[in-house]
Amino acid sequence: MYLHKNKKGFTLIELMVVVAIIGILALLGLRLYAGQQEKAKNSIVKANAGTIQTLIQAELADKAVEDIDDESEMNSIVTKAGIHNPILGSQQTASHFGNAAPSASTDNAGDVYVWLNLSDSVFHVNGWGADGNDVYADDLTARR
């Protein structure tokens, strides 16, 4: 009696090669996806900075610079904006307001900050990205 071998299916080597290829593709996809997430979060920070700039400009239409040049007034504007920090996952309620540009900060990543140049009464608005650096190379400005 002659035994007929049934050769259906894949060998172990073939299966291991396929699994290795799928693993490599998955790792490449995850690296690209992680980079896209950071870019998206930085885009939200840019949009938040634009919102704050618009609100400051609207306030300056009705008030003098001296009427909104303190931290409590800036915090009120930021709170009124209802902006969401995409990196920390919370609502931003403080403006990090000052009279000079703050240094890079990973503690406040995702927050928008405002500073006032006292010499020319120009408000500068920017935000910290996921890496703690500014999202805009040049600050957005608002003036009367």
Per-segment meaning from a language model:
Residues 1-10:
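N-terminal leader/signal peptides at the extreme start of proteins
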Residues 137-139:
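Edge beta-strands of extracellular beta-sandwich domains
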Residues 22-39:
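C-terminal juxtamembrane segment of a hydrophobic transmembrane alpha-helix
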